[in-house]
Design a protein with these regions (language model features):
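Acidic, Ser/Thr- and Gly-enriched intrinsically disordered low-complexity segments
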Residues: 1-175
Length: 175
């Protein structure tokens, strides 16, 4: 039996920065807003009807919840000595959402990471990969050791579709 595919959020800017789900999310909330502008139609000087005009589409968003549980392993995700701790995963997500080089003069380096969310192989009928940025992170710490070590945490991550190539083209044109 093949191994279960795990959801991964990886930085497109730093190949060593990624978070793989310890437990896959129970659900993914994918949404996209479509803008419609309302216009009153006047008939004989009376606003009689409302017409709508397509105004464009907002980027797709994805919300998911990840559970990191090290309760049985003193805060580590597995019994392996080199295993990540719960807080390592939380910090990695926060790092992907943080500005990479705050003092840099280059605006492309003075921004948070572009990310890629994947779950399974490209050839499957699963959720398509999403190039995105992290829009929000909410961490709920659920269990602690006597010394304060975080043993379990639930992290809700909000992501917004972003195409770095298209953004780079717009940036070059606007200079």
């Amino acid at each position: 039996m093949p191994a279960t595919a795990k959801l991964t959020i990886a930085s497109k800017d730093d190949v060593n920065l990624q978070v793989t789900a310890q437990y896959n999310p129970r659900e993914l909330l994918v949404s996209q807003t479509i803008d419609w502008h309302e216009h009153q139609i006047l008939k004989k000087d009376v606003a009689d009807e409302v017409d709508v005009e397509f105004g464009g589409m907002k980027p797709e968003t994805l919300q998911l919840e990840l559970l990191f549980d090290g309760f049985e392993n003193q805060g580590r995700l597995t019994r392996d000595v080199g295993s990540f701790a719960v807080m390592n995963q939380v910090q990695a997500l926060k790092e992907m959402a943080s500005v990479r080089f705050p003092g840099d003069r280059d605006p492309d380096r003075r921004r948070p990471h572009y990310c890629l969310v994947v779950w399974g192989d490209k050839g499957t009928l699963g959720v398509p990969p999403l190039r995105c940025v992290i829009e929000s992170i909410a961490v709920k710490y659920l269990a602690f050791a006597d010394d304060g070590t975080v043993l379990r945490a639930s992290v809700t991550v909000g992501l917004k579709a972003a195409d770095p190539v298209a953004i780079a083209r717009r940036t070059v044109r606007s200079r």
